[in-house]
Curated annotation (Swiss-Prot):
Pfam families: Ribosomal_S5, Ribosomal_S5_C. Part of the 30S ribosomal subunit. Contacts protein S4. The keyword Ribosomal protein applies. The lineage of its organism: Archaea, Nanobdellota, Candidatus Nanoarchaeia, Nanoarchaeales, Nanoarchaeaceae. One of its GO terms (cellular component) is small ribosomal subunit. This is Small ribosomal subunit protein uS5. The N-terminal domain interacts with the head of the 30S subunit; the C-terminal domain interacts with the body and contacts protein S4. The interaction surface between S4 and S5 is involved in control of translational fidelity. With S4 and S12 plays an important role in translational accuracy. GO terms for biological process: translation. It comes from the Archaea. Belongs to the universal ribosomal protein uS5 family. The gene is rps5. Residues 61-124 form the S5 DRBM domain. GO terms for molecular function: rRNA binding; structural constituent of ribosome. HAMAP family: Ribosomal_uS5_A.
Length: 231
């Protein structure tokens, strides 16, 4: 958590946040302002949670999952190790971000991933777009949407209340931190490439806010973007 007294903003947006002239993250995201300082997100979303995507590590007969991927490169000086970390941040109330960090030091890679996830934070459109449910509560997504990253393509479909998040365990983390409780996910392509899988889902969540929604559908589906608790 950032100490707002010690924080010295480097951007105009950061100064406006520190001075208290901007107090809502949705104001920034709705106006498409570019966030260049992770401290802005720390101040406006104090309840932000962090999770790390786990990669499957195979060493001989042993298999395990680790919150990082390690690669080694042979050089004249010897083997050089590089770590890759994917962080997912969210407040479970309509805001989520995903970031990738790389470094020869694991702690630095984690820090880079968290900071980039904060800089990439988006507000997520939620609603009840399932014809089987039609409860009007924002527990799912309002309509079907597709996302793509590399060779991976995903389709997100609204699900009735109680279905839960029907997806891979690592992908579930994005929806939980975004505040989505029920959704169906179909994945195509090389989904074992976890990095592309995660970013394909993130791409789909971004596109939820790109659709022009009619007033009657807003009322019918309980459509909302960003925070519900603070409205």
């Amino acid at each position: 958590m950032v100490n707002i007294e010690e924080w010295q903003p480097k951007t105009k947006l950061g100064r406006l946040v520190k001075e208290g002239k901007i107090t809502n993250i949705d104001e920034i995201l709705s106006n498409k302002y570019v966030i260049r300082e992770p401290e802005i997100v720390d101040v406006l979303l104090p309840n932000l949670e962090v999770e790390f995507m786990k990669w499957r590590i195979i060493r001989g007969k042993f298999r395990s999952k680790k919150p990082y991927r390690m690669a080694q490169k042979k050089t004249a000086e010897g083997n050089k190790t590089r770590y890759e970390v994917i962080a997912i941040v969210g407040d479970k109330d309509g805001h989520v971000g995903v970031g990738l960090g790389r470094s020869s030091d694991l702690l630095i890679a984690r820090e880079k991933a968290i900071n980039r996830a904060k800089l990439n934070i988006i507000k997520v459109a939620r609603g009840c777009g399932s014809w089987e449910c039609a409860c009007g509560a924002p527990h799912s997504i309002p309509y079907q949407v597709e996302g793509k990253s590399g060779s991976v393509r995903v389709i997100l479909k609204p699900a009735p209340k109680g279905v839960g998040i029907v997806a891979d365990d690592e992908i579930k983390k994005i929806f939980r931190l975004a505040g989505i409780k029920d959704v169906w996910v179909r994945s195509f392509g090389k989904t074992k490439t976890k990095m592309n899988h995660v970013f394909a889902v993130f791409d789909a969540l971004k596109k939820l806010s790109n659709v022009r929604v009619q007033p009657f559908f807003i009322k019918f589906s309980g459509y909302t973007e960003g925070s519900i608790i603070n409205k």
